[in-house]
């Protein structure tokens, strides 16, 4: 993946949350905003990668996290991020 891409921005955003550099409130408020803002550019850069990110992090992560405790929220996002990164490692993109 090229450096300084919209996809890289979104991956860094998620990783900062998982590393404790962003609060859950910040993550919850900003995730959808940033995804909408960067989605078109991500899709131009790599449509398959964008669809994978959207599936694992938005649909199966963020959208399923409502009502979870902070700890369970972070664990769910970590699990989904790991699945996304595994798809990257397996060379699907």
Predicted regions located by residue number:
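Acidic, Ser/Pro/Thr-rich low-complexity regulatory regions
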Residues: 1-93
